[in-house]
């Protein structure tokens, strides 16, 4: 998706962002986040305005849009996640207000786990997401499967881009 040089430049800017621990109804997660464009307000259960997407993220959004075969402006939400060693994210499905979810991994790989209920059991898949690579969740991968990232061994960032669902 991007070159090492582009990754280095992105990380240089990302390191200066005002990260805060992810707050889920008062529970502080072990990863840190900063969001732009739009953000999901958990207490109000709605998408609200956030700070504008910084200029340094716009070229990456353009590349993600080409990858997803969408217009760049459709990716109205950007969430930058910082995972220090030992940090991960539990099983979840992104909020229904968002449609497509695309992510770009920076600095270190991670195991991106997927699961969906199949009767009384779970179908499971694991994808190793390499640094500088991208993934796209759409259709069943977005709407039927949950995903998680187990605790990482090395410091990494992910930049997640989301489109808004038009029928909500």
List where the protein language model places each region.
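Non-heme Fe(II) oxygenase metal-center motifs and adjacent flexible, charged/small-residue loops
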Residues: 1-168
